[in-house]
Amino acid sequence: MIASIKKISAFIVVLGFVLINQAIGQQKFVFEKPAMGSPFTISIYANDSVKAAQAASLAFHCADSLNEIFSDYIDSSELNRLNATSGGNRYARVSESLFDILKYSIEAARLSDGAYDISMGPVVKLWRKARKEKRLPDPDSLKVAMQKVGYRFIHLNDKERSVWLEKKGMLLDLGGLGKGYVAQATLNVIQSRGFNSSMVNAGGKIAIGEAPPGRKGWRIGITIPEEKEALLPRLLLLKNTSVATSGDIYQHLDINGKRYSHIIDPKTGIGMTRQRNVTVIAKDATISDWLATACSVLPEKKSLKLIKKFPGAALLISELQNGKLIRKSTPNFESYFEN
């Protein structure tokens, strides 16, 4: 009996030694290609470069497939085909992926009291043109576009997996949530192949798996605004979570000396004019993506209240007010910085 126990103990020790050495022997493989209008980067720790490349290839295929469904830039996308049915008197059946992201989006709009709203497509279209022409949208055109906006006019039928866009001319736009959704979906594909220590960066919307071998987490660089528009680089240490940053320091339009953010207030149809940078950490990249967008629109107190609805989520807001930089954060955000 004692001899058997010794043999079992020896086996466990040897097995543990082998597993540890396998983990430590893993290398980091990085794969990158353009997707959804942004650099799309996949990082995988693995022992086998060929298998890692195969997993990355499957993940990129997943991203491309979802983009063909969600993109409003692709005329033949499923989203645009759905938009074309707006104002009709019937529900349109949609794919499982599109229905799933629409459910996410409507829940996001409800929880944020409309600060995130996927029905802003007609207004977003005007602002895209305005950015190209470096002028504000025509007020009359903006008024007409705003009449087509409202997430409450999007109706879902769970049983039939179908959608009715009540108002004619409605255009759904999944910006502010789509990249996070795709990042999370592609990470799930990679992890399903056995590569748990992996990370996906979809144009700054980052889905993060288990920590790299022998480390406490992935080192994620973010930039925090400082006084006089300087940027302070900081490192976060993260695992099994996601992070997204949003704000007008990255995309904005300057007209007549006034700065307009690429993020539009759904209540007014006007690009945000305050200078704010928002970083959100949450368990799912879809959630961190739309929360970062919503918290760029909401007042600070409402942003902090919204984050509390998601256990473990963290928020950092940096805003320039009257020439002075103000920072607000949830108590747990500081713990994610690398010491």
Residue ranges and their predicted role:
Residues 14-22:
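Hydrophobic h-region of N-terminal signal peptides that target proteins for export
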